C-alpha cells in the first residue's frame, strides 16, 4: 500500500488515502444515485491522485489539464507565507551566528572566543567590574583555540569591543536582509535571499 491524495472536482487537496502499490495516475470516486425510472446516475465525488506531491507546495492542487501537481494557493498569499518563513529563518541564523564565536586580536594575535548568552553576560559583568574597581586591572579569559589567557584591562576592553562589533555587524546584516525581504515581490526573490 502507498499514499495517494483525494482531491475535489477542482483538484484541491482534501485528504490522504491508501491505494495499492501498483496504482498510478488519477481515478474517479463515483457514487450512484437512483433516479427516475429505476436508473442509477453516476456522480463523481472527487478523484484519487496516485502521483506523489512535490515538496514545497503549500496548497497542492491537481491540474487535470497538465496532469501534474501545481501550487493552489494564490500568489499573494504564497508570497506572504514565504516572507514569514524566510524572516524566521534569518532570525534563527542571525542568533546562531551571534551566539557562535568571534575572533579578536586584543592580545596582539588572533584568538577565537565564545559569544553565547552566558559569555555575553560574563563579558558585560567583567567590563562593568573593571570600570567600577580601578585595582581590577587584569582577568583571565577562556579562548576557544588556546585555552585560558590573561588579559589586561586595556586588552579586555578591546576584546569586549570586538565582541560588540561582532554582534552589531551581524544585526546590521540581518536588518539589511530584512529590508531586502520586505521589498521582495516574488517567491523567487524571497528564496534568493541567503544569510
Predicted features and spans:
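A preference for well-ordered globular domain cores
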Residues: 1-195
